[in-house]
């Protein structure tokens, strides 16, 4: 099933449907828009017919200089069986030749009162959001001090319990158990909860808890950009864990790499506090403060000074 149809665009931007009503269920498969200026001049060799077509004052003022035969020909070639729609901006008058051609090909022709550039920008942002690559990850997403922290790990390791403690400490839950992730940009991943389990948290022994009902609207968020991955794993005595923080792990989700911390779980460790500190430390690093690197530099200086003393 297509993610976006022309009907969705009409409803989202309150567009006036002028003609071609039979085609409002056509799928929109790309976030790219086309302003067919060169096509108005008669060059259709590289006409991107699969895109939404946007006609502004520039295109329509040139169109008015054409002969009646040219006008009819241009609009007939503009309306194809794969064109999802044609939008006229600025509330301009829709050419009768376009209405006739669109009715024959069932191409929706819409009109907006917005300026062309603003409409183009808003359409692109909307389509990029809706058509972005998506995936689902088993984990919990929490907003901790403004940092989107994705908590992962095997079932039963304590992800939901950690999220519950974080919410109790004033942070906000985004999703539990299943996190839907969409890639809105090359380096931007946004996580949200499936509609069915939105605001719900499952705790073994307690069952399902509605966090918004229990803690209020301030305890939940609908979506959040993911900045950090915290992987919880049962403590393995055979494994060497990072104790300085100089080595930064990365994990790839879709086409975006995110910093990852592996936190060993054992009785007595307060995981919620550790996740809080991890989020604060992440913010510090973004501000250019890296405690591990500063300690390493001081240690190197001390060793070097000690070596000189022995000399």
Curated annotation (Swiss-Prot):
> What GO biological process term is on the record, naming one?
regulation of carbohydrate metabolic process
- E.C. no: 2.7.11.-, 2.7.4.-
Annotated binding of ATP, by residue:
153-160
Cofactor(s) essential for the protein = Mg(2+)
- The UniProt record lists the keyword Kinase: yes
Has keyword Kinase?
yes
Q: What enzyme class is recorded for this protein?
A: transferase
List the catalysed reactions.
[HPr protein]-L-serine + ATP = [HPr protein]-O-phospho-L-serine + ADP + H(+); [HPr protein]-O-phospho-L-serine + phosphate + H(+) = [HPr protein]-L-serine + diphosphate
For the region Important for the catalytic mechanism of both phosphorylation and dephosphorylation, give the residue spans: 201-210
Function, as annotated: Catalyzes the ATP- as well as the pyrophosphate-dependent phosphorylation of a specific serine residue in HPr, a phosphocarrier protein of the phosphoenolpyruvate-dependent sugar phosphotransferase system (PTS). HprK/P also catalyzes the pyrophosphate-producing, inorganic phosphate-dependent dephosphorylation (phosphorolysis) of seryl-phosphorylated HPr (P-Ser-HPr).
Q: Which HAMAP family does the UniProt entry name for this protein?
A: HPr_kinase
| Subunit structure of this chain's protein | Homohexamer.
Q: What is this protein called?
A: HPr kinase/phosphorylase
Q: What is the lineage of its organism?
A: Bacteria, Bacillati, Bacillota, Bacilli, Bacillales
The gene it comes from is hprK
